[in-house]
Every structure is written in structure tokens, then in C-alpha cells.
């Protein structure tokens, strides 16, 4: 059975394909279909609302079961920013003091185009995050990754949604060449538990298997597996 994952982000596609490798499913991307995804304006109030809206729209468009992801980084010291604006945070004007960015989606988070353009935006986003937290000690650099996955049938019926969270802390400098987004700055809580004096690794320094075990998206994908297994069985 073909399953559309509504993303052109190669990192997200690799994660999902690794995690469903044992199921009789073929994860396809918009590139595999030879058609660009239709734009869905992400104007929902939460990650969940945006993920559900995309999954329903893309399932109807493709005629396939579809999975959509909405995810982001929420930093405690920034009142939850960048939150739903994580992908394009560096392109936005500074948020006002009353803007709970982790819950409000006032702009469309469109897919980010070529890999080179996405990497450049990641760099700008990380620069902005480092500047925003400049001078803050480790105890005030708490953060979490959040991911919501929504699954819809070809007729647009919503099957369900799942959520994954990865708590951690923002480092003081980039480390690691793996991952994408804020991974070079994000130190997962499991690494912090190593104890005083231990060298902790960022998400970008973990192997693929280690990241799958710890990440917000890995947790969400694992929660989604029973739904996907039922679909593969024809349930």
C-alpha cells in the first residue's frame, strides 16, 4: 500500500521510511508522484490543527492515505517561541510580548523548497536563537521539540493524530553535522542525564538510530505505527 508523506523535507522522509521498514507500506513523497503539493495555509491554532488540515487536504488531492506533520521547537525563555513558526522564524518580525507563538499560527508554513535554501534558512534560524538566548545560563535554556502527525484516508476522513515530545536544552554553540533544523543546538534531556562532567551531545551528533529513539518525531511515528499496521492489514 502506498502512503503519502506530505513533505519534501528529506530528513523527515528518511525518519519515516526507517520507522515503517517492517510494514508492507511504501512511503511516497510528492516528488515520487511527480506533482507539487498543493499549498495549505497553516492557520490553525495549534500544531494538531495544522497537521490535521494538511493530512485531509493532501489525502483528497492524492487519492492515497496521507500523513502530515506539524512540528517545532518551543523555548521556555522565549515564551514558547518559535513554536509553530519554527521553520521560518528568521523571516518573521520580532514577536510582541503578548504573542504566545507556540500556540498561534498566523502565517503559512509552506514547504521550504530546494535543500540548499532550507539549509540556509536553518542557519539563520539558529543564529536568531543563539542571539535571543545570549548570556542566559543553562538552567534558563530549557526547550522542547513537539511533533504532531495526522493520518487521513483517501476520501479525506481523518483516521487520527498522535503527538511526540522531546524535552531538552539549547546549547551555546552549534555542534554536529547530522539532522536538520535546530538539531545542532538542541541537547536532548537523555543526554543531560549523563551526569556532571560528561560530554553531552546535540541532536545533530546522534546516530540515526539514537535520534529515532529520542526524537519527538520518532515518538510520534512509533505511536502512529498501530494505525499504519491496521491500514496495511486492510482493517
Curated annotation (Swiss-Prot):
InterPro entries per record: dITP/XTP_pyrophosphatase, ITPase-like_fam, RdgB/HAM1
GO cellular component, one term: cytosol
GO terms assigned for molecular function: dITP diphosphatase activity; ITP diphosphatase activity; metal ion binding; nucleotide binding; ribonucleoside triphosphate phosphatase activity; XTP diphosphatase activity
Residues engaged in binding substrate: 7-12, 71, 180-183, 211, 216-217
Record-listed E.C. numbers: 3.6.1.66
Keyword Hydrolase applies: yes
Residue positions binding Mg(2+): 70
Record keywords: Hydrolase, Magnesium, Metal-binding, Nucleotide metabolism, Nucleotide-binding
Domain of life: Bacteria
Cofactor details (free text): Binds 1 Mg(2+) ion per subunit.
Single GO BP term: purine nucleoside triphosphate catabolic process
Disulfide links within the chain: none
Function text: Pyrophosphatase that catalyzes the hydrolysis of nucleoside triphosphates to their monophosphate derivatives, with a high preference for the non-canonical purine nucleotides XTP (xanthosine triphosphate), dITP (deoxyinosine triphosphate) and ITP. Seems to function as a house-cleaning enzyme that removes non-canonical purine nucleotides from the nucleotide pool, thus preventing their incorporation into DNA/RNA and avoiding chromosomal lesions.
Entry similarity comment: Belongs to the HAM1 NTPase family.
PANTHER family reported in the protein's UniProt record: INOSINE TRIPHOSPHATE PYROPHOSPHATASE, INOSINE TRIPHOSPHATE PYROPHOSPHATASE/HAM1 PROTEIN
Name of the featured protein: dITP/XTP pyrophosphatase
Organism: Anaeromyxobacter dehalogenans (strain 2CP-C)
